Amino acid sequence: VGMRFFNVWAEEGSRDDMLYRMLQEGTARYLTRHKRDWVHVEDVCSAIEKLIYSDYTGVVDVGTGVATSVLEFANALIGENELPIQEWTPKEPDILKANPVVLREMGWNPTPFLDKIQSK
């Protein structure tokens, strides 16, 4: 089985170049209005578990299927901020989100980003 991971995030253990960590450390230089599918690492792990115990042999999107803007992601995590908005980024699609139909048919139900933040 092949797995296509979308924007994986976690409160701890993220790399230096990941947006969540840059926001926490104050090293992010700008934000965009691009929409991305933010999937929590716990949901990714449960998706992998579902897939390794299944007979599925294709490629699977591992994401919530819900797109939230980079700006909304930042504001939900650190509150309103003064970072500049970069309106256009070359080679970046405006919206990028998973189509998790295969995993949902297996009973996988990830928590959308904003719901995950509000539950913390």
Model regions and ranges:
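Short-chain dehydrogenase/reductase
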Residues: 6-7, 59-62
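Short, hydrophobic alpha-helical segments
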Residues: 52-56
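NAD(P)-dependent short-chain dehydrogenase/reductase
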Residues: 1-37, 41-45, 49-50, 76-78
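Residue-level signal for the nucleotide or nucleotide-sugar donor/cofactor binding architecture
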Residues: 13, 17, 36-42, 65-68, ...
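Amphipathic terminal alpha-helices
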Residues: 77, 113-120
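C-terminal "lid/loop" region of Rossmann-like NAD(P)-dependent oxidoreductases
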Residues: 29-33, 59-60, 68-75, 79-100
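Residue-level preference for the first positions of well-ordered beta-strands
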Residues: 1-2, 57-59
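Structural element of the ATP-grasp superfamily
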Residues: 22, 102-104
